[in-house]
Amino acid sequence: MRKGFVKEVLSKIKYDARENEEDYYIVIEHRGTYGNIKKIPVKMITLGHGYFFIEDTQIPYHRILAVIKKDGKVVWKKRGLGDEFKF
């Protein structure tokens, strides 16, 4: 996938009227949590250029491991993550 594609996926989820952002989560690499990953509802983030924000916290897009739906379907996954990686 090309660079910046995850931002395009998130933009579609947040701004396309056919999508409901409450149905989606992002999984990020988050040092200090169990397993170093954290699941965050897409409705809680604000998109920026090169970063996304959770309230006042700025997080780079490269920390996103996956975009998933509530039902567990993987919408986007970072290149290099095997199928055995569970979110």
Curated annotation (Swiss-Prot):
InterPro entries for the chain: MJ1316, UPF0248
Pfam family, one: MJ1316
Family assignment from sequence similarity: Belongs to the UPF0248 family.
Protein's recorded name: UPF0248 protein TSIB_1445
Source species: Thermococcus sibiricus (strain DSM 12597 / MM 739)
Phylogenetic classification of the source organism: Archaea, Methanobacteriati, Methanobacteriota, Thermococci, Thermococcales
